[in-house]
C-alpha cells in the first residue's frame, strides 16, 4: 500500500503560485528548488489553462470560427492556400514547444494570447500565436512563413510586444513599437504634438518628443520680451495626454521628452523629477532624457562655466532649430555672437544636479550627442532618442499653416523591434538564415505600417524602412558556457557575436534592395554608398583573442566574416544599396525575455531568482536561464558586477550596432552621486551612445518595479 508523505500532500494542495514561490525558498539541503517551478507550470496548465481554453473539433473548424466571429483577420489567411495554413499549424503543434518557466507561461496567457471578447477563455496556445504572427509577416510567402514559425518556436527570434500581440487579429493595435517626434518652436507644432501623443498612444506605442527647439522661459513672443513659458507647460500637456490615452484600456500611454543640456530651461526641466518638486511643475509619469555633447564634459573637466543658448535667438540668427545645431562644433562661435542670448551655470554643478535627480528618480536618460553623430552612417543629425534610449535615427522638421495642415511633411521616426536570443542563435543550424529571417520579418512590419493619423511618422517610415534587431540572453549564454560576465572572454565573445550579426544583417538588407530595386531614401548620401561604413571591418583584425571564444564559434559551426566577405559585401552594397536605413538597436527586453526564458537584453541578471511584481497577482518568481545549483557562481548580479564591466560589455557591442543599446547602470545601496558621475564619464569615454535608467540596490523594495515602455521593453 502506497504511503502519502506530508510533503506530497502539501504539494498536491498547493496552487501554481505557491509552487512558483517555492523558488525563493531553499530546501533542507540549502538548494534552490527548481523542480517546484516545473511543477507550477504543470499545475498552471492542468488547473487553469486547459479548463479555460476553448476547444474545437479541428484546426479547420477553429480558423473558420475565429474568422467568422471577428477574432482573426481573414485577409491574412486568404493570402495562402488553406491546406498550407493547416499544415503550418500542424507543424507548429508538432514542434514539442514547452515553456521553461512558470513566469513565461503565465506572461503569455495573461498578456499575449487571444481571448474571448469577455476575456474569460483562451482561443490560442503559444504555437497558434506564433503561426499567426508568421503568416501575417510573411504576407503570402510560404517559405518565409515556415522559417519565421521555426525561428520563433525555437526561441531564436522574438518580435516585440506590439507585433507579437497584434499580428493576425481583426481587432488590434499597430504592429509598431515606438515613435519619436520633433516639436518645433510654434503653437501649430505644439498642438500637433499633443494630438500625436493621443493618436499614437491609443495605438499602443511609446512616444518620445524633442523639446530642444522650444524657446526658453522668458524668451520673446512676437518680439515682446519675457512672454514665453518655456518647456514645462508643454511637458504638462503631454503628460496629461498620455494619461488620458491607452490601448483598449490595457495600459496607460507612455511618453518621454528630451532636452539639450545647453537649453536655458535645463535645470527647471530636471527639477520636475525632484521628490519635493512643487506640484505645479512636478512631472510624475513622463520619462526625461538629456542630450549631452562633448563640450559639456570638457567644460566640467576644466571646472568652467557652461553657456546655455537661447533657441529663439539661434533660430533667428542661424535659420536652424536648436536641435539641428552641433553645439560642440559651434560653441565658441555662439559664445562670441552678441545676438545670441546666453546664461551660465557651472558645468560640474550641472553634472552634480543630474546625478542627484537620478539618485531620486532613476531619470533622466542620457544621449551622448557627439558620440551618436560620429557613429551615424546616415546623412542628417540625430538629436534625440526614444522611451528606452536605444533608437537613434535622423529626423527632419515639418511645417504647418494656421489650420494645422501640413505645408511640408518632415520625417519623424518609428521603429520596428524584435530580438534574437543569443544562446539559441549560437545553437542555430544556420545563423545566416536566422538573421535573414529576422530582418525580413521586421522589414515586413515596416512595410505594413502606415500611421496615417501622424503623416510625418508615415513619411519617415516610408522613406527609411528602419528596423531595430535586438539581442537578449547574453548573461544566460555566458553562464551556460562557464564564462563570467565582463571577463576578457565575455568581452571577446560580445565583440565577435555582434560583428557576425552585423555582416548578416547588412547582407540581408542588401539582398532586399537588390530584389526590390529600391533603397532607403538618402542612401546615396550615406556612408554605405561611399563605402566608408566598411572601413573598420577592412582595416582591423576581427578574430577571437581567446581560445575559449574561438572554440565556441567552432563548436557552433559559425564562420566569422572574413576580410574578403566584407570586401564583397561593400562592393555589393555600393552597387545595389541597402533597403533599411537602420538595422540594429538593442532594447531592454522585458516580458518577451521571460517567455523566451532569456536574461534581459545584454546586461547582467538583477538576481538569481528575480522577483516580479505583477499587478494584482502579486509576486512571481523567475529563475535565471541555464542556472543550476552547481553553477550559481556564474550568476553574479548586476549590482555586484558594477557599472564598469557592464559599460565594457556594451562598448564591445556598440562598435557594431548602428543605433543604440538600452544600458541601465546598477549601483549598490552605498553609492553616491560621485559614483554615478564617474560611471557617466567612463561610459562617455568608452564610446557608449546612451544611458537608460540608474538603478540603486534597495533591498526593501525588491519585487517592485518602475514601469517603462512595454513596447520597447518587448
Swiss-Prot record:
GO terms for molecular function: ATP binding; ribonucleoside-diphosphate reductase activity, thioredoxin disulfide as acceptor. Its EC number is 1.17.4.1. The record marks 178, 415 as: Important for hydrogen atom transfer. The record marks 692-693 as: Important for electron transfer. Pfam families: Ribonuc_red_lgC (PF02867), Ribonuc_red_lgN (PF00317), RNR_N (PF08343). CDD domains: RNR_I. It comes from the Bacteria. Tetramer of two alpha and two beta subunits. This is Ribonucleoside-diphosphate reductase 2 subunit alpha. It comes from Salmonella typhimurium (strain LT2 / SGSC1412 / ATCC 700720).
Amino acid at each position: 500500500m502506497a504511503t502519502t508523505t506530508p510533503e506530497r500532500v502539501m504539494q498536491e494542495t498547493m496552487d501554481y503560485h505557491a509552487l512558483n514561490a517555492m523558488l525563493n525558498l531553499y530546501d533542507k539541503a540549502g538548494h534552490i528548488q527548481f523542480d517546484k517551478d516545473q511543477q507550477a507550470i504543470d499545475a498552471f496548465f492542468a488547473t487553469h489553462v486547459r479548463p479555460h481554453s476553448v476547444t474545437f473539433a479541428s484546426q479547420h473548424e477553429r480558423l473558420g470560427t475565429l474568422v467568422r466571429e471577428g477574432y482573426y483577420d481573414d485577409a491574412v489567411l486568404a493570402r495562402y492556400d488553406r491546406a498550407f495554413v493547416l499544415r503550418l499549424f500542424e507543424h507548429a503543434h508538432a514542434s514539442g514547444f514547452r515553456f521553461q518557466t512558470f513566469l513565461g507561461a503565465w506572461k503569455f496567457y495573461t498578456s499575449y494570447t487571444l481571448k474571448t471578447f469577455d476575456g474569460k477563455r483562451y482561443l490560442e496556445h503559444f504555437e497558434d500565436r506564433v503561426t499567426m504572427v508568421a503568416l501575417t509577416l510573411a504576407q503570402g510567402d510560404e517559405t518565409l512563413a515556415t522559417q519565421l514559425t521555426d525561428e520563433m518556436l525555437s526561441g531564436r527570434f522574438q518580435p516585440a510586444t506590439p507585433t507579437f500581440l497584434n499580428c493576425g487579429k481583426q481587432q488590434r493595435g499597430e504592429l509598431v513599437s515606438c515613435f519619436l517626434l520633433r516639436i518645433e518652436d510654434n503653437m501649430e507644432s505644439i498642438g500637433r504634438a499633443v494630438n500625436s501623443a493621443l493618436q499614437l498612444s491609443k495605438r499602443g506605442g511609446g512616444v518620445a518628443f524633442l523639446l530642444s527647439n522650444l524657446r526658453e522661459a522668458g524668451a520673446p513672443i512676437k518680439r515682446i520680451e519675457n512672454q514665453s513659458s518655456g518647456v514645462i507647460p508643454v511637458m504638462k500637456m503631454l503628460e496629461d495626454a498620455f494619461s488620458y490615452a491607452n490601448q483598449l484600456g490595457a495600459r496607460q500611454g507612455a511618453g518621454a521628452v528630451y532636452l539639450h543640456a545647453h537649453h536655458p530651461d535645463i535645470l527647471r526641466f530636471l527639477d520636475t523629477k525632484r521628490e519635493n518638486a512643487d506640484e505645479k511643475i512636478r512631472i510624475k509619469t513622463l520619462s526625461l532624457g538629456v542630450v549631452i555633447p562633448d563640450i559639456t564634459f570638457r567644460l566640467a573637466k576644466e571646472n568652467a562655466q557652461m553657456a546655455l543658448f537661447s533657441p529663439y535667438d539661434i533660430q533667428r540668427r542661424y535659420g536652424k532649430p536648436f536641435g539641428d545645431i552641433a553645439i560642440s562644433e559651434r560653441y565658441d562661435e555662439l559664445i562670441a555672437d552678441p545676438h545670441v542670448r546666453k546664461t551660465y551655470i557651472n558645468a560640474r554643478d550641472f553634472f552634480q544636479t543630474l546625478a542627484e535627480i537620478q539618485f531620486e528618480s532613476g531619470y533622466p536618460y542620457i544621449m551622448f550627442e557627439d558620440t551618436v553623430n560620429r557613429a551615424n552612417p546616415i546623412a542628417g543629425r540625430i538629436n534625440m532618442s526614444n522611451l528606452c534610449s536605444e533608437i537613434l535615427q535622423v529626423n527632419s522638421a515639418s511645417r504647418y499653416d494656421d489650420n494645422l495642415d501640413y505645408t511640408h511633411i518632415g520625417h519623424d521616426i518609428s521603429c520596428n523591434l524584435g530580438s534574437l536570443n543569443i544562446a539559441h542563435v549560437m545553437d542555430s543550424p544556420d545563423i545566416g538564415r536566422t538573421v535573414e529571417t529576422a530582418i525580413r520579418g521586421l522589414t515586413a512590419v515596416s512595410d505594413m505600417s502606415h500611421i496615417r493619423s501622424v503623416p510625418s511618422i508615415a513619411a519617415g517610415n516610408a522613406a527609411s524602412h528602419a528596423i531595430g534587431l535586438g539581442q537578449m540572453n547574453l548573461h544566460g549564454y555566458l553562464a551556460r558556457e562557464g564564462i563570467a560576465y565582463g571577463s576578457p572572454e565575455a568581452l571577446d565573445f560580445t565583440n565577435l557575436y555582434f560583428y557576425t550579426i552585423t555582416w548578416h544583417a547588412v547582407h540581408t538588407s542588401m539582398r532586399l534592395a537588390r530584389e526590390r530595386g529600391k533603397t532607403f531614401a538618402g542612401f546615396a548620401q550615406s556612408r554605405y554608398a561611399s563605402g566608408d561604413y566598411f572601413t573598420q571591418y577592412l582595416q582591423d583584425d576581427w578574430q577571437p583573442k581567446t581560445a575559449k571564444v574561438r572554440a565556441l564559434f567552432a563548436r557552433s559551426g559559425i564562420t566569422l566574416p572574413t576580410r574578403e566577405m566584407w570586401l564583397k559585401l561593400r562592393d555589393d552594397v555600393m552597387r545595389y544599396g541597402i533597403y533599411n536605413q537602420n538595422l540594429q538597436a538593442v532594447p531592454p527586453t522585458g516580458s518577451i525575455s521571460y517567455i523566451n526564458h532569456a536574461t534581459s537584453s545584454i546586461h547582467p541578471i538583477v538576481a538569481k531568482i528575480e522577483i516580479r511584481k505583477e499587478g494584482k497577482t502579486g509576486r512571481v518568481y523567475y529563475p535565471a536561464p541555464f542556472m543550476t545549483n552547481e553553477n550559481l557562481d556564474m550568476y553574479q548580479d548586476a549590482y555586484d558586477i558594477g557599472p564598469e564591466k557592464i559599460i565594457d560589455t556594451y562598448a564591445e557591442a556598440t562598435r557594431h550596432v548602428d543605433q543604440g543599446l538600452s544600458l541601465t547602470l546598477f549601483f549598490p545601496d552605498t553609492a553616491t552621486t560621485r559614483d554615478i558621475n564617474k560611471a557617466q564619464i567612463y561610459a562617455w569615454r568608452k564610446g557608449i551612445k546612451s544611458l537608460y535608467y540608474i538603478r540603486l540596490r534597495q533591498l526593501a523594495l525588491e519585487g517592485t518595479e518602475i514601469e517603462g515602455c512595454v513596447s520597447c521593453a518587448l
